[in-house]
C-alpha cells in the first residue's frame, strides 16, 4: 500500500488517523485494525478486527 494514501484516508467510524502496521490499518481511538488485502485497504467496520486485549 502506498504511504501517500495514508494522508487522505481516515477511520470510517471516527474519521481519525490510521496507522499502517504490517498488513493492517490501525485506528488507535476505536481500537480497530482494518485489513489491507492485495494492497487495497478494506475500510469496512464489519471487516475490522478489535485490537483490545481482554
UniProtKB/Swiss-Prot annotation:
Gene3D superfamilies: 2.20.25.10
SUPFAM superfamilies linked to this entry: Trm112p-like
Top-rank taxon: Bacteria
A UniProt-annotated Pfam family: Trm112p
Family statement: Belongs to the UPF0434 family.
Name of the protein: UPF0434 protein BCI_0256
Lineage: Bacteria, Pseudomonadati, Pseudomonadota, Gammaproteobacteria, Candidatus Palibaumannia
